[in-house]
Amino acid sequence: MDIPLRTHATTTRDRPAVLRYSRTWDAGVSSIAEARDAVADLLARARPAPERRSVQDAQLVVSELVTNAAKHAPGPCALGLEVLPGARALRVIVTDTSREPPRRRPPDPRRVGGHGLHLVAMLARDLEVTWPAHGKRVTVTVPLTPRATG
């Protein structure tokens, strides 16, 4: 299921539009690149616009979480993105079919792979794992720094 990038709420003086994105994949590597592109597209519409480093951090977090879902869970995975009010943070929700909680492996600079959750922990906050009827949902919040103006 593909829900295109769009504004879901009406802009009023008291409440700005909420930017959201959601997508479900059957899994696979192509979903990772699409997820990174979705982050960039969504944040390009955020106001105030986040600085480039914040966009890259958000793309890395999403890439790691979607990679974990595609690698460790059989079946489809879903991605939800929501720019929080004032464009100060991006909420990221990744859902997959595995009931296994994500696990951080002990750091080992000689190991290839297995560093994704460490990166997520460095760049995001409020990591929460819940178990809906089928699988799990991982939610994090990535802080966004507004781009300097002038």
Task: Report each predicted region and the residues it spans.
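Conserved short strand/loop->alpha-helix "switch" segment adjacent to the catalytic nucleotide/phosphoryl-transfer site
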Residues: D37-S63
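Short, well-structured hydrophobic secondary-structure segments
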Residues: V61, V66-H72
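Conserved beta-strand-loop-beta-strand hairpin that lines the nucleotide-binding pocket
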Residues: M1-D26, A70-G150
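Short beta-to-alpha transition helix within the HATPase_c
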Residues: A17-D37, D41
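Polar low-complexity intrinsically disordered regions
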Residues: M1, D14-P16, S30, E34, ...
